[in-house]
């Protein structure tokens, strides 16, 4: 067994606070909240009130306003949660949301509409990454690059709360 040199131990303890970068530590934490701002085209991962990382996103092809019905091309707004992870998505990887929630169902029913379903946070699959940065292209989902969804997929667990704001 090795004997610890006191001098080296003291030096290590003195410099430890400088070695532990807060950004590195924050990025290693599991997010307990996902916040999406449609207008800003941003998805942010939080652990408690600390930002872990933010990503540029693309939305449904008709992004303004609350999703009203199936096929309207809008991304829903409200409180959701991650229901499941799909490693076999045609968009590389995806995280399913509990859309429609009760508020969505009630709103759609009041207008005689089907609210739709299958809203995900997903990658590009085989879509062109350059087109991804030019315009909103999904049917209502939230899209990031394949590299980004791989990172998000590893960090975010089923049950994580997702807020989507206009």
List each language-model region with its residue ranges.
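Secretory targeting signals
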Residues: 1-4, 15
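N-terminal export leaders
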Residues: 6-10
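Hydrophobic h-region of N-terminal signal peptides that target proteins for export
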Residues: 13-22
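N-terminal post-signal-peptidase region of extra-cytosolic proteins
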Residues: 27-32, 59-83, 105-107, 146-147
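A structural motif detector for short, solvent-exposed N-terminal "entry" segments of globular domains
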Residues: 27-63
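Exported/periplasmic cell-wall-interacting domains
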Residues: 29, 84-166
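Well-ordered beta-strand positions in beta-sheet-rich domains
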Residues: 33, 54-56, 79, 118, ...
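Short, solvent-exposed loop/turn elements at domain surfaces
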Residues: 43-45, 53, 64-67, 90-93, ...
């Amino acid at each position: 067994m090795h004997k610890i040199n006191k001098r080296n131990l003291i030096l290590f303890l003195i410099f430890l606070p400088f070695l532990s970068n807060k950004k590195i530590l924050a990025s290693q934490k599991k997010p307990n909240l996902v916040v999406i701002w449609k207008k800003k085209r941003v998805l942010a991962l939080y652990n408690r009130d600390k930002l872990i990382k933010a990503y540029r996103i693309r939305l449904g092809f008709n992004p303004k306003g609350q999703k009203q019905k199936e096929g309207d091309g809008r991304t829903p707004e409200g409180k959701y949660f991650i229901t499941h992870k799909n490693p076999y998505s045609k968009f590389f990887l995806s995280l399913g949301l509990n859309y429609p929630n009760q508020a969505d169902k009630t709103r759609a029913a009041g207008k005689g509409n089907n609210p739709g379903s299958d809203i995900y946070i997903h990658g590009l699959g085989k879509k062109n990454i350059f087109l991804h940065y030019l315009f909103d292209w999904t049917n209502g989902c939230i899209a990031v690059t394949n590299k980004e969804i791989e990172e998000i997929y590893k960090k975010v667990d089923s049950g994580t709360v997702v807020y989507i704001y206009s």
